[in-house]
Regions:
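Core beta-strand elements of the Rossmann-like FAD/NAD(P) dinucleotide-binding domain
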Residues: 8-11, 174-184, 362
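N-terminal Rossmann-like FAD-binding beta1-loop-alpha1 element of flavoenzymes
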Residues: 13-39
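Glycine-rich FAD pyrophosphate-binding loop
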Residues: 31-53
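Glycine-rich active-site loop/strand segments that organize a redox cofactor
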Residues: 59-91
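Mobile, glycine/GP-rich and aromatic-enriched active-site lid/loop segments adjacent to catalytic centers
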Residues: 104-155, 231-380, 385, 452-568
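Helical element adjacent to the flavin cofactor pocket in flavoenzyme catalytic cores
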Residues: 129-156, 160-179, 219, 225
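Glycine-rich loop(s) and the adjacent beta-strand/alpha-helix scaffold that form part
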Residues: 187-246, 381-394
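Long, amphipathic alpha-helical stalk/connector segments used for oligomerization, subunit docking
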Residues: 400-488
Length: 568
């Protein structure tokens, strides 16, 4: 098989990733301007990204009696201080605004008898959100001069003199290579799953917390292009219902269930209540012989039983089916819990692109929003929307201020030549040849390496310097092996590029884990060489890929009110 068609497209703004942040950015761009938009989506925007299956709560909302500063304080405490407060503040100020917009678009938000939103805790409100992504996608479909290209896999940025010019990619459905030229680009491709060996093997390996189709594409493209990245050492590990990997927050907040060990002892207060400490406590209780660990649901009311069964049937049906299969309601049997494999996801931790306050990366004209943007944890759905909005407003503002005549700065001949070169790269993998390893085999090897040597489930999320050195050596060897892979069709070609993306991200994760010489977040970054926490590491650990090497950059923490701009 070979690339048969080559298409060169031009637009004012290219949005890579039609998930939550990408769709909301498109809506904002059209509200503020008439600039042309192309959304490049690997799946189909109707059900793509983290929001594909919907959610039953808005987890980032300023409830009555609270203010944006409270949310910033919460996120800062959960991350033990390593956050960009300017990003958190600008995000928090927009949470309720984007929620109101979603309600106007048709999202059902539950209300009490007084017409007030039904709160779930200090930062959440309840919704009927199964159709949240289709609502967004439908709104995007009505925009004028907004072209959605579904089933296109973007593989590389076009960067000239540290300025974004567009991106390359290929169709997953036919043998077409794309070169999309744009004046501004928003990366909204989500985080990275599948780096580590998952909880469940074989056929069930994709029964995981984070979408398995989010493979770190945006991170990898940015890393290879020399964009500065931040805080990849702050991995995210979710505490989930065992085996089903269903959410635990619905039980913990919905019925007030505490974390208990096999002796019935409440252990959550022993280790701390931050996200990483809840995982760490569960790991330690098991290691010290007091496992399994549970959420204590025994003794809840029949009404609470019914509420939990319905809630999980809506968002994680396997958990409800597990109760049915066991013939026991939650009130009759505690729910066993476990930690997932680590993920890199800037919507929950601070890992991702290093951006200014307007969400522009260190590559001029390239913006990042949602899970791919760093420095701003605890975004959830609404935070991703706010970041898409902030980036969109700044892109429009910069385009409005552009005094050039708008003519392309690259000739049609050079554009065609560049696409020919990229198509040849794709053709290399589409050319049949003997291969010693399959894409899946190298992916499994990568996950085993990361699991064994870079703090995966099998090592209780712990690592040391010698293990990280081995991990780097082995991942580099696997990268060499990818050069001989063969794809029989465009879908298999996508798998090869997803693997290459993950391997690129793995090297950054390994470098960052080794660079932060402390253990600030138990389990998230459990460094056995440096088991304590040090004030010397109250700083950002950043990196930039230059001349074939990752160079570490250390930056001082920034303030809440100051607006950050890239100066070096």
């Amino acid at each position: 098989m070979k690339i048969e068609n080559k298409k060169i497209l031009h637009t004012d703004i290219l949005i890579i990733g039609g998930g939550t942040a990408g769709c909301y950015a498109a809506l904002t761009i059209r509200e503020k301007s008439d600039y042309s938009i192309i959304i490049a989506e690997k799946a189909n925007i109707k059900r793509s990204g983290c929001l594909a299956a919907g959610v039953n709560a808005i987890n980032a909302y300023i409830v009555k009696g609270r203010k944006p500063e409270d949310y910033v304080d919460y996120a800062k405490k959960d991350a033990d201080g390593i956050v960009r407060e300017d990003l958190l503040m600008t995000m928090s100020e927009g949470l309720n605004r984007v929620t109101d917009k979603m309600e106007k678009l048709g999202l059902v938000i539950l209300k009490d008898e007084n017409g007030e939103y039904v709160a779930r805790g200090n930062r959440n409100i309840k919704i009927n959100g199964e159709n949240m992504k289709p609502i967004l996608a439908e709104a995007v479909s009505k925009l004028t001069d907004c072209t959605v290209i579904n089933r296109i896999n973007i593989t590389d940025y076009i960067v000239e003199n540290n300025t974004i010019k567009g991106a390359y990619g290929f169709s997953i459905e036919d043998a077409t290579a794309y070169e999309i030229r744009a004046k501004k680009v928003l990366c909204a491709t989500g985080g990275a799953a599948g780096l580590y060996r998952p909880n469940n093997p074989g056929f069930s390996r994709h029964k995981m917390w984070y979408p398995p189709f989010n493979t770190g594409a945006g991170y990898a493209m940015g890393i290879r292009s020399g964009a500065e990245m931040t805080t990849f050492e702050m991995r995210f590990i979710a505490l989930r219902c065992k085996d089903t990997i269903a959410p635990t927050g619905t039980i913990a907040q919905g019925v007030g269930a505490k974390q208990v060990n096999s002796l019935g002892e409440v252990y959550e207060t022993k280790y701390g209540l931050t996200t990483s400490e809840r995982v760490y406590g569960t790991v330690m209780e098991n290691l010290e012989g007091r496992g399994p660990c549970y959420l204590r649901t025994e003794g809840i009311s029949p009404q609470q039983d019914e509420s939990l069964r319905k809630a999980y049937l809506n968002m994680a049906p396997s958990q409800t089916l597990k109760w049915v299969e066991a013939g026991k309601n939650p009130s009759e049997q505690n729910v066993e819990i476990e930690g997932t494999e680590p993920y890199i996801v800037g919507g929950h931790t601070a890992s991702g692109y290093w951006v200014n306050t307007e969400r522009e990366t260190t590559i001029h004209g390239l913006y990042a929003a949602g899970d791919v943007a760093g420095g701003c944890p605890q975004k959830y759905v609404t935070g991703a929307m706010v970041e898409g909005e902030i980036a969109a407003i700044d892109m429009v503002s910069k385009l409005d201020a552009d005094t050039s005549d708008g003519s392309p700065d690259t000739s049609a001949f050079d554009e065609k030549k560049a696409l020919e070169a990229k198509a040849s790269e794709y053709d290399h993998f589409l050319t049949e040849r003997p291969q010693m390893f399959t894409t899946e085999a190298i992916e499994e090897a990568m996950q085993k390496v990361m699991d064994n040597y870079a703090g995966g489930i099998s090592t209780h999320y712990q690592f040391n310097g010698k293990q990280l050195a081995l991990a780097k050596e082995k991942i580099n060897h696997l990268i060499e092996l990818t050069g001989d892979l063969y794809a029989s069709d465009m879908h298999e070609l996508m798998f090869i590029y997803e693997l290459k993306e993950r391997l690129t991200v793995c090297l950054s994760v390994i470098a960052h884990l080794g660079a932060r010489k402390e253990t600030r977040w138990h389990s998230f970054a459990e460094n056995l060489d440096y088991p304590g926490k040090s004030d010397d590491w109250m700083k950002y650990v950043n990196s930039r890929y230059e001349n074939g090497q990752l160079h570490m950059i250390y930056r001082e923490l920034g303030g809440r009110e100051a607006r950050y701009e890239h100066n070096d």
